[in-house]
Amino acid sequence: MRKIIVGSRKSKLALTQTNWFIDQLKALGLPYEFEVKEIVTKGDVILDVTLSKVGGKGLFVKEIEHALLTKEIDMAVHSMKDMPAVLPEGLMIGCTPKRVDPRDAFISKNGASFKELAEGAILGTSSLRRSAQLLAARPDLQVKWIRGNIDTRLRKLKEEDYDAIILATAGLQRMGWDDEVITEHLDETLCVPAVGQGALAIECREDDKDLLQLLAHMNDAITERTVAAERVFLHKLEGGCQVPIAGYATLKENDTIELTALVGSMDGSVLLKETVVGTNPEEVGLEAAGRLIKQGAKELILAANKEQQ
């Protein structure tokens, strides 16, 4: 019986996601054992600055990918939104399980909705994507950076001077806390989700055919296609955590993919947004990127990167 070593970050959410996925594999009743190996990533260690200042995309995966390449582990369960657009040679996304709620969750200290927040209220987020879109809707708000895992951020909301914070609904759902803490879900039209938000990425080595066969049982074709369109868009624009960039695709009638893509300025004063429909994920992603580039997306990205330096 083969033992599969599964790499995971040490956070409660990462371990919850990893153990959930292992349980799904065990339920298949195939001859495999599983062992979790906890790995500390750069993103877990550097907590005093925003993600965009310390390298953005890849902060939570590089050390895990190194362990995959050196065969210390066989596979890893990531949040898809943490995955860079391009993976190291020899690694691949072995499967994408069914996506859960991709929306952002708004959590306020006193139960006020986003619209009801007092003028000048302090909003906690460490995401340029969230801050740009929410400042576009409410320029009066003050954005204050907040880092740490879910529990830490919820504690900071209670104890510090934040009036509200934004977290991914998916993480709260996986922890079983969504009903307890969420004030409201932000509609995708108000705050377009991050590329891959709500989805998991199961990463493994390309040459591990045995494991790839096992993972195929857990792949969700709709999630795979929609996330692929989002990631092509992200790759074409070379966007990461350093840029206010968003992309969310859904499957519509007749097997068509509808992708809403967005690039913004850091302060939310400019938001470029396009919706593209098509059947081929790559073509949809490239078309969305192309349309935004024509509107000046590359210039916004350059400006955002300069502001981060």
Swiss-Prot record:
Q: What gene is behind this protein? A: hemC
Record-level Gene Ontology MF annotations: hydroxymethylbilane synthase activity
Q: How is its cofactor bound, per UniProt? A: Binds 1 dipyrromethane group covalently.
Which E.C. number(s) belong to this protein?
2.5.1.61
Reaction catalysed by this enzyme: 4 porphobilinogen + H2O = hydroxymethylbilane + 4 NH4(+)
Sum up the protein's function in the record's words. Tetrapolymerization of the monopyrrole PBG into the hydroxymethylbilane pre-uroporphyrinogen in several discrete steps.
Q: Which SUPFAM superfamilies match?
A: Periplasmic binding protein-like II, Porphobilinogen deaminase (hydroxymethylbilane synthase), C-terminal domain
Family per UniProt? Belongs to the HMBS family.
Q: Which GO terms describe its biological process?
A: protoporphyrinogen IX biosynthetic process
Q: Print the keywords alphabetically.
A: Porphyrin biosynthesis, Transferase
Report the PANTHER family cross-referenced here.
PORPHOBILINOGEN DEAMINASE (PTHR11557:SF0)
- Other observations noted: The porphobilinogen subunits are added to the dipyrromethane group.
In the UniProt record, does the keyword Nucleotide-binding occur?
no
GO cellular component, alphabetical, reads: cytoplasm
* Pfam families assigned: Porphobil_deam, Porphobil_deamC
Q: What is this protein called?
A: Porphobilinogen deaminase
The record ties this protein, via Gene3D superfamilies, to: Periplasmic binding protein-like II, Porphobilinogen deaminase, C-terminal domain
Q: Which cofactors does it use?
A: dipyrromethane
Q: Which domain of life is it from?
A: Bacteria
Which residues does UniProt call coiled coil? none
- Pathway membership of this protein? Porphyrin-containing compound metabolism; protoporphyrin-IX biosynthesis; coproporphyrinogen-III from 5-aminolevulinate: step 2/4
Subunit: Monomer.
Q: Which residues carry this modification: S-(dipyrrolylmethanemethyl)cysteine?
A: 241
